[in-house]
């Protein structure tokens, strides 16, 4: 089930990116968290630096946005959304994508 959830999560992130509802990169996500319409969900790769994970979780907690550190590496996350480099975090702006991606992230983490 975990491999299926991982594949589904990566696919949903790619679809979300193509629909224009995904913010890519930690700096952009942090900036958007303070915006008028912040992302509804933030996904952070498990191999992101400790500083990045800490920064994202604290900022999300402060702004009351769900944050999920998932067992994906930055390369997988970047590849799934069509980026050539490593991406440590993404923000989901659409409520329907956020709901499904959040469910898949919880399954992947084993906390469904």
Which residue stretches match the model-derived regions?
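N-terminal targeting/trafficking signals and adjacent low-complexity tails
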Residues: 2-3
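N-terminal first-folded block
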Residues: 7-44
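Solvent-exposed alpha-helical segments within well-ordered globular domains of core cellular machineries
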Residues: 11, 31-34, 54, 58, ...
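Structural motif
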Residues: 20, 40-41, 66-68, 87-90
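Short, ordered loop/turn segments at secondary-structure junctions
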Residues: 27, 47-48, 72-75, 95
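N-terminal positively charged helical leader segments and presequences
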Residues: 37-57, 65
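Mid-chain, well-packed structural core segment of small domains
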Residues: 56-87
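C-terminal structural segments of small proteins and small subunits
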Residues: 78-112
């Amino acid at each position: 089930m975990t491999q299926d959830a991982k594949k589904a999560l990566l696919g949903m992130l790619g679809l979300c990116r193509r629909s224009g509802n995904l913010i890519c990169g930690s700096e952009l996500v942090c900036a958007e968290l303070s915006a008028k319409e912040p992302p509804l969900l933030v996904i952070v790769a498990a191999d992101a630096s400790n500083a990045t994970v800490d920064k994202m979780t604290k900022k999300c907690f402060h702004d009351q946005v769900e944050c999920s550190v998932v067992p994906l590496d930055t390369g997988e996350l970047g590849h799934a959304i069509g980026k050539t480099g490593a991406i440590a975090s993404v923000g989901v702006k659409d409520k329907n994508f956020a709901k499904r991606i959040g469910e898949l992230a919880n399954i992947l983490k084993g906390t469904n």
